[in-house]
Amino acid sequence: MTSATASLTPALNSLGFAKPPSETRVVVAMSGGVDSSVVAAELACEGYDVVGVTLQLYDHGAALAKKGACCAGRDIHDARRVAEEMGFPHYVLDYENTFREAVIDEFADSYLGGATPVPCIRCNERVKFKDLLETARDLEADCMATGHYIQRKMGPAKAELHSAADANRDQSYFLFSTTQEQLDYLRFPLGHLASKAETRALAAKHGLSVADKPDSQDICFVPNGDYASVIEKLRPGAGEPGEIVDMDGTVLGAHRGVIHYTIGQRRGLGIGGLETPLYVVKLDPDARRVIVGPKEALSTRHVPLREINWLGDAPLSSRAEWPIAVKVRSTRPPRDAILRPISDTEATVELLTPEEGVSPGQACVFYDPDGTRIFGGGWIWRGA
């Protein structure tokens, strides 16, 4: 390219478009928290045509069968207030029915089936990055921005998903199911920040009312962390008692419902006084049994996966083996593994070092063993 040609090429704005920010419309998914509020404020100050959208997803009162217990309304109020403070339009969309069908119902049914689900991933996959993204397109937005801590980088071939600069805030585990088409349209302006302190400093700089708002800790529709109560409200009879047995089938005690237990759990089993500490190693919801065993029984080397979302440059099935790193829990670091495809949507992962407490219903996320790129992931299941 000659210097004359280069001078005629429009410079890309901060969102990657060859036009001024004022001509670039961006829908910001606003939860009412500090992260998405900062994204909206920063983009508005840069001169972008910002449209804030908040989804009404749940009502704590409905989830817990308590009148007047809705906290979602406060988040909507906070998002609307930030939009007013920064001077851009804000809309609230009622997605409660969609959220219940796509996320909450599966959450309850997964526990009934003896799995340990991750509803935040399903929400991103089936609601925020599906229906909300389509709404952004309907609003003729050039892209949609969120407050997630993850990075979108342009690689040699296409947009790539990379871990956040702040490893403590990285949300890549919860975003593995982002498709390539969605990634092309999405932007994550906070992914490069070194710490949450920087986000709060930006909120304070803009004078946002949510600058000191605490981070949410619980699943949004389980505000007090008591997921079993929510499941029993949604699926009456879900807490049927049954037997706690060892790996040989010997009855050791009784439990208060399979939904109260997860793989790897040790506390709260009510079978103390034994010489060897025992952990939940398997759940059998059909027989209403909780199977316990020694810690070594939790070690898993082979992990069956389905519903794989692949973000690699070559097709997943183009190779018999892929050397990768994987996370089988959001709180654990990536571990070296070998990915063996069965089809474009199913595979087996061999962990080079066994992991404890690998549970059906959790995600297994694929990482570049030598870098920050995310290659997608899949859902752990019991296998055929």
UniProtKB/Swiss-Prot annotation:
Record's keyword annotation contains Chloroplast: no
Keywords linked to the UniProt accession: ATP-binding, Cytoplasm, Disulfide bond, Nucleotide-binding, RNA-binding, Transferase, tRNA processing, tRNA-binding
Positions of region (Interaction with tRNA): 169-171
Reaction(s) catalysed by this chain's protein: S-sulfanyl-L-cysteinyl-[protein] + uridine(34) in tRNA + AH2 + ATP = 2-thiouridine(34) in tRNA + L-cysteinyl-[protein] + A + AMP + diphosphate + H(+)
Binding site for ATP: A29, M30, S31, G32, G33, V34, D35, S36, L55, G147
SUPFAM superfamilies per the UniProt record, alphabetical: Adenine nucleotide alpha hydrolases-like
Subcellular location: Cytoplasm
Enzyme class label: transferase
Entry's EC annotation: 2.8.1.13
Entry's family note: Belongs to the MnmA/TRMU family.
Descriptive protein name: tRNA-specific 2-thiouridylase MnmA
Protein source organism: Dinoroseobacter shibae (strain DSM 16493 / NCIMB 14021 / DFL 12)
Organism classification: Bacteria, Pseudomonadati, Pseudomonadota, Alphaproteobacteria, Rhodobacterales
